[in-house]
Amino acid sequence: MKNMFQKCMSAFVAAAFFVSTMGTSFAATPETVQAKLDLCETDTYGQPQTGAIMERINKLEKDYDGTHRTGSMMARTNAIYDSMYTNTATPSILAELNGIEWTIRHEVSATPVQERVTDMETELSGKTSEGTYTKRIRALADFAFGANQLPIEQTSVAANTLVKVALAEEVTSKNVKKGDTVHFTVADDVIVDGRLIFAKGEPGTAVVEKVQQARNFGRNAKLELTDYKVKSMDGTIVDAYVGEEAKEEMKQYAMAAGASLAGIVILGPIGIIGGAFVKGKDIDLPAGTEMYIETTGDTMLYGVTTTLAK
Protein backbone atom coordinates (compact mmCIF):
# COMPACT_ATOMS: atom_id res chain seq x y z
CA MET A 1 0.00 0.00 0.00
CA LYS A 2 2.84 2.35 0.93
CA ASN A 3 4.69 1.61 -2.31
CA MET A 4 1.52 2.16 -4.31
CA PHE A 5 1.03 5.53 -2.62
CA GLN A 6 4.60 6.54 -3.36
CA LYS A 7 4.20 5.59 -7.04
CA CYS A 8 0.96 7.52 -7.26
CA MET A 9 2.57 10.44 -5.49
CA SER A 10 5.44 10.50 -7.99
CA ALA A 11 3.04 10.55 -10.91
CA PHE A 12 0.91 13.19 -9.24
CA VAL A 13 3.89 15.40 -8.51
CA ALA A 14 5.00 15.20 -12.13
CA ALA A 15 1.54 16.26 -13.23
CA ALA A 16 1.26 18.98 -10.63
CA PHE A 17 4.53 20.60 -11.65
CA PHE A 18 4.10 20.70 -15.40
CA VAL A 19 3.32 24.42 -15.16
CA SER A 20 5.79 26.71 -13.42
CA THR A 21 5.52 30.37 -14.30
CA MET A 22 8.46 32.65 -13.41
CA GLY A 23 7.83 36.27 -12.48
CA THR A 24 10.69 38.18 -14.06
CA SER A 25 9.52 41.78 -14.34
CA PHE A 26 10.48 44.26 -11.63
CA ALA A 27 8.03 46.59 -9.97
CA ALA A 28 8.07 49.88 -11.83
CA THR A 29 9.65 52.78 -9.95
CA PRO A 30 7.31 55.79 -9.94
CA GLU A 31 8.58 58.52 -12.22
CA THR A 32 6.24 61.48 -11.81
CA VAL A 33 6.04 63.88 -8.87
CA GLN A 34 2.45 62.82 -8.24
CA ALA A 35 3.23 59.10 -8.22
CA LYS A 36 6.24 59.51 -5.92
CA LEU A 37 4.30 61.71 -3.52
CA ASP A 38 1.43 59.21 -3.44
CA LEU A 39 3.81 56.39 -2.50
CA CYS A 40 5.72 58.43 0.10
CA GLU A 41 2.50 59.66 1.69
CA THR A 42 0.92 56.21 1.72
CA ASP A 43 3.94 54.73 3.50
CA THR A 44 4.12 57.71 5.87
CA TYR A 45 0.50 58.53 6.69
CA GLY A 46 -1.47 55.54 5.38
CA GLN A 47 -2.90 57.19 2.27
CA PRO A 48 -2.13 59.89 -0.32
CA GLN A 49 -2.78 63.40 0.97
CA THR A 50 -4.94 66.09 -0.59
CA GLY A 51 -4.03 69.66 -1.45
CA ALA A 52 -1.61 71.41 -3.74
CA ILE A 53 1.58 69.57 -4.68
CA MET A 54 3.85 72.18 -3.05
CA GLU A 55 1.89 71.90 0.21
CA ARG A 56 2.33 68.14 0.17
CA ILE A 57 6.07 68.40 -0.49
CA ASN A 58 6.41 70.95 2.33
CA LYS A 59 4.58 68.66 4.76
CA LEU A 60 6.76 65.63 4.03
CA GLU A 61 9.94 67.71 4.32
CA LYS A 62 8.80 69.22 7.61
CA ASP A 63 7.74 65.87 9.07
CA TYR A 64 11.01 64.13 8.16
CA ASP A 65 13.60 66.93 8.23
CA GLY A 66 12.03 69.85 10.08
CA THR A 67 12.98 72.20 7.25
CA HIS A 68 12.35 72.82 3.57
CA ARG A 69 14.79 71.94 0.83
CA THR A 70 15.66 74.15 -2.10
CA GLY A 71 15.50 73.28 -5.77
CA SER A 72 12.86 72.30 -8.27
CA MET A 73 9.67 70.48 -7.42
CA MET A 74 11.04 67.26 -8.93
CA ALA A 75 14.39 67.59 -7.16
CA ARG A 76 12.73 68.04 -3.78
CA THR A 77 10.38 65.13 -4.39
CA ASN A 78 13.27 62.92 -5.47
CA ALA A 79 15.19 63.81 -2.31
CA ILE A 80 12.26 62.73 -0.14
CA TYR A 81 11.74 59.56 -2.15
CA ASP A 82 15.43 58.61 -2.09
CA SER A 83 15.73 59.12 1.66
CA MET A 84 12.77 56.82 2.24
CA TYR A 85 13.51 54.04 -0.26
CA THR A 86 17.00 54.16 -1.76
CA ASN A 87 19.71 51.96 -0.26
CA THR A 88 23.04 53.06 -1.71
CA ALA A 89 25.78 54.43 0.55
CA THR A 90 23.52 54.13 3.59
CA PRO A 91 20.27 52.29 4.39
CA SER A 92 17.00 54.09 3.71
CA ILE A 93 14.66 55.39 6.40
CA LEU A 94 12.32 52.45 5.88
CA ALA A 95 15.21 49.99 6.11
CA GLU A 96 16.25 51.49 9.43
CA LEU A 97 12.68 51.46 10.73
CA ASN A 98 12.24 47.83 9.71
CA GLY A 99 15.47 46.91 11.49
CA ILE A 100 14.39 48.66 14.68
CA GLU A 101 10.93 47.10 14.67
CA TRP A 102 12.29 43.61 14.07
CA THR A 103 14.79 44.02 16.92
CA ILE A 104 12.00 45.05 19.27
CA ARG A 105 9.26 42.67 18.11
CA HIS A 106 10.97 40.08 15.88
CA GLU A 107 8.38 40.94 13.28
CA VAL A 108 7.83 43.79 10.84
CA SER A 109 4.44 45.40 10.23
CA ALA A 110 3.05 47.00 7.10
CA THR A 111 1.53 49.98 8.91
CA PRO A 112 2.57 53.55 7.97
CA VAL A 113 5.60 55.29 9.45
CA GLN A 114 3.67 57.63 11.73
CA GLU A 115 1.79 54.71 13.31
CA ARG A 116 4.83 52.45 13.62
CA VAL A 117 6.97 55.14 15.26
CA THR A 118 4.22 56.12 17.69
CA ASP A 119 3.44 52.50 18.61
CA MET A 120 7.10 51.64 19.28
CA GLU A 121 7.65 54.79 21.35
CA THR A 122 4.61 53.96 23.46
CA GLU A 123 5.68 50.34 23.81
CA LEU A 124 9.21 51.26 24.92
CA SER A 125 8.73 54.39 27.02
CA GLY A 126 5.00 54.62 27.64
CA LYS A 127 4.67 57.89 25.74
CA THR A 128 5.22 59.43 22.33
CA SER A 129 8.00 61.85 21.47
CA GLU A 130 8.10 65.15 19.62
CA GLY A 131 10.24 66.11 16.67
CA THR A 132 10.74 64.88 13.14
CA TYR A 133 10.33 61.25 12.14
CA THR A 134 14.05 61.10 11.41
CA LYS A 135 14.91 62.29 14.93
CA ARG A 136 12.42 59.91 16.54
CA ILE A 137 13.69 56.95 14.50
CA ARG A 138 17.26 57.75 15.57
CA ALA A 139 16.11 57.79 19.20
CA LEU A 140 14.42 54.41 18.77
CA ALA A 141 17.61 53.04 17.22
CA ASP A 142 19.62 54.30 20.18
CA PHE A 143 17.24 52.57 22.57
CA ALA A 144 17.20 49.32 20.61
CA PHE A 145 20.91 49.09 19.76
CA GLY A 146 22.67 51.47 22.14
CA ALA A 147 23.62 53.63 19.16
CA ASN A 148 21.72 55.72 16.64
CA GLN A 149 23.29 53.78 13.78
CA LEU A 150 21.82 50.35 13.15
CA PRO A 151 24.06 47.30 12.56
CA ILE A 152 22.95 47.06 8.93
CA GLU A 153 25.26 45.83 6.18
CA GLN A 154 24.96 44.95 2.52
CA THR A 155 24.79 41.24 1.77
CA SER A 156 24.88 39.25 -1.44
CA VAL A 157 21.71 37.17 -1.65
CA ALA A 158 21.90 34.32 -4.13
CA ALA A 159 19.22 33.35 -6.61
CA ASN A 160 16.90 30.57 -5.42
CA THR A 161 16.99 31.70 -1.79
CA LEU A 162 13.89 30.16 -0.22
CA VAL A 163 11.27 32.35 1.45
CA LYS A 164 8.36 30.86 3.40
CA VAL A 165 5.23 32.98 3.01
CA ALA A 166 1.63 32.86 4.24
CA LEU A 167 -1.52 34.08 2.50
CA ALA A 168 -2.82 37.32 4.00
CA GLU A 169 -6.35 36.62 2.79
CA GLU A 170 -8.57 33.74 1.75
CA VAL A 171 -8.00 32.60 -1.83
CA THR A 172 -10.47 30.33 -3.56
CA SER A 173 -11.12 29.35 -7.13
CA LYS A 174 -14.50 31.05 -6.77
CA ASN A 175 -13.47 34.44 -5.38
CA VAL A 176 -10.60 35.38 -7.70
CA LYS A 177 -10.28 36.12 -11.40
CA LYS A 178 -7.43 36.56 -13.85
CA GLY A 179 -5.44 39.69 -13.09
CA ASP A 180 -6.35 39.84 -9.39
CA THR A 181 -3.59 40.51 -6.87
CA VAL A 182 -3.07 37.98 -4.10
CA HIS A 183 -1.40 39.27 -0.94
CA PHE A 184 0.87 37.34 1.39
CA THR A 185 3.41 38.02 4.14
CA VAL A 186 6.78 36.50 4.98
CA ALA A 187 6.08 33.69 7.47
CA ASP A 188 9.61 33.09 8.80
CA ASP A 189 12.74 35.21 9.00
CA VAL A 190 15.31 34.56 6.28
CA ILE A 191 18.90 35.05 7.47
CA VAL A 192 21.83 35.05 5.05
CA ASP A 193 25.44 35.14 6.31
CA GLY A 194 24.33 36.31 9.74
CA ARG A 195 22.12 39.11 8.43
CA LEU A 196 18.35 39.30 8.42
CA ILE A 197 17.25 39.75 4.80
CA PHE A 198 13.52 38.94 4.79
CA ALA A 199 11.75 39.69 8.07
CA LYS A 200 8.62 37.97 9.28
CA GLY A 201 5.63 40.15 8.43
CA GLU A 202 7.06 41.78 5.30
CA PRO A 203 4.43 41.97 2.52
CA GLY A 204 4.41 40.34 -0.89
CA THR A 205 2.08 39.87 -3.85
CA ALA A 206 1.35 37.54 -6.73
CA VAL A 207 -0.96 37.89 -9.73
CA VAL A 208 -3.67 35.44 -10.74
CA GLU A 209 -2.70 34.16 -14.17
CA LYS A 210 -5.48 31.62 -14.71
CA VAL A 211 -8.56 30.34 -12.91
CA GLN A 212 -10.49 27.26 -13.94
CA GLN A 213 -13.61 26.34 -12.02
CA ALA A 214 -14.43 22.77 -11.02
CA ARG A 215 -16.18 21.03 -13.90
CA ASN A 216 -18.09 17.87 -14.69
CA PHE A 217 -16.53 14.42 -14.86
CA GLY A 218 -14.44 14.95 -11.73
CA ARG A 219 -12.27 17.72 -13.12
CA ASN A 220 -10.99 19.79 -10.22
CA ALA A 221 -10.57 23.55 -10.14
CA LYS A 222 -7.18 25.00 -11.06
CA LEU A 223 -5.53 28.22 -10.01
CA GLU A 224 -2.28 29.58 -11.42
CA LEU A 225 -0.32 32.48 -9.92
CA THR A 226 2.59 34.38 -11.41
CA ASP A 227 4.67 37.56 -10.96
CA TYR A 228 5.59 36.94 -7.32
CA LYS A 229 7.17 39.89 -5.51
CA VAL A 230 8.27 40.09 -1.89
CA LYS A 231 9.63 43.02 0.09
CA SER A 232 12.99 42.56 1.78
CA MET A 233 14.01 44.02 5.12
CA ASP A 234 15.56 47.07 3.44
CA GLY A 235 12.38 47.78 1.48
CA THR A 236 13.58 46.44 -1.86
CA ILE A 237 10.94 44.67 -3.95
CA VAL A 238 12.47 41.32 -4.90
CA ASP A 239 11.19 39.17 -7.76
CA ALA A 240 10.44 35.56 -6.87
CA TYR A 241 8.94 32.44 -8.39
CA VAL A 242 8.16 28.83 -7.55
CA GLY A 243 11.23 26.93 -8.69
CA GLU A 244 12.39 23.39 -8.07
CA GLU A 245 13.64 24.06 -4.55
CA ALA A 246 10.37 25.69 -3.53
CA LYS A 247 8.40 22.81 -5.03
CA GLU A 248 10.48 20.26 -3.14
CA GLU A 249 9.96 22.13 0.13
CA MET A 250 6.20 22.19 -0.45
CA LYS A 251 6.17 18.53 -1.37
CA GLN A 252 7.90 17.66 1.90
CA TYR A 253 5.62 20.06 3.76
CA ALA A 254 2.49 18.42 2.38
CA MET A 255 3.71 14.88 3.04
CA ALA A 256 4.86 15.73 6.57
CA ALA A 257 1.40 17.12 7.28
CA GLY A 258 -0.10 13.79 6.29
CA ALA A 259 -1.84 15.09 3.20
CA SER A 260 -3.59 12.34 1.31
CA LEU A 261 -3.13 11.81 -2.41
CA ALA A 262 -6.73 12.76 -3.06
CA GLY A 263 -6.46 15.88 -0.92
CA ILE A 264 -3.34 17.57 -2.28
CA VAL A 265 -4.04 20.64 -4.37
CA ILE A 266 -2.63 21.46 -7.79
CA LEU A 267 -2.08 25.19 -7.53
CA GLY A 268 -0.30 25.92 -10.76
CA PRO A 269 3.04 27.63 -10.13
CA ILE A 270 2.54 27.42 -6.37
CA GLY A 271 2.93 23.63 -6.44
CA ILE A 272 1.71 21.32 -3.70
CA ILE A 273 -0.19 22.59 -0.67
CA GLY A 274 -1.52 20.56 2.24
CA GLY A 275 -4.75 18.72 1.52
CA ALA A 276 -6.56 19.95 4.63
CA PHE A 277 -7.63 23.10 2.78
CA VAL A 278 -9.49 21.43 -0.09
CA LYS A 279 -13.26 21.38 -0.04
CA GLY A 280 -14.65 19.08 -2.68
CA LYS A 281 -13.38 19.96 -6.13
CA ASP A 282 -12.81 23.66 -5.50
CA ILE A 283 -9.58 25.24 -4.33
CA ASP A 284 -10.17 26.89 -0.97
CA LEU A 285 -7.12 28.29 0.82
CA PRO A 286 -7.75 30.24 4.04
CA ALA A 287 -5.65 33.15 5.21
CA GLY A 288 -2.50 31.83 6.82
CA THR A 289 -1.96 29.02 4.30
CA GLU A 290 1.82 28.64 4.01
CA MET A 291 3.90 28.01 0.90
CA TYR A 292 7.41 28.56 -0.43
CA ILE A 293 8.81 30.84 -3.11
CA GLU A 294 12.41 31.52 -4.11
CA THR A 295 14.28 34.57 -5.33
CA THR A 296 14.70 34.91 -9.09
CA GLY A 297 18.24 36.29 -9.33
CA ASP A 298 21.32 37.30 -7.37
CA THR A 299 20.93 40.65 -5.64
CA MET A 300 22.57 42.92 -3.07
CA LEU A 301 20.36 43.75 -0.09
CA TYR A 302 20.87 45.41 3.28
CA GLY A 303 20.37 43.13 6.28
CA VAL A 304 20.40 43.57 10.05
CA THR A 305 23.27 41.74 11.74
CA THR A 306 21.92 39.04 14.05
CA THR A 307 23.24 36.10 16.02
CA LEU A 308 20.11 34.07 15.39
CA ALA A 309 20.57 30.89 13.39
CA LYS A 310 19.22 30.74 9.86
Where do the PLM segments sit?
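Bacterial N-terminal signal peptides that target proteins for export
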Residues: 2-12
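Sec-dependent N-terminal signal peptides of Gram-negative outer-membrane/periplasmic proteins
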Residues: 2-3, 26-29
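C-terminal segment of classical bacterial N-terminal signal peptides
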Residues: 17-26
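Alpha-helical, heptad-rich or low-complexity scaffold/stalk segments
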Residues: 28-141
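N-terminal targeting leaders of membrane proteins
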Residues: 138-156
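Contiguous beta-sheet cores, especially beta-hairpins with glycine/small-residue-rich turns
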Residues: 150-266, 272-310
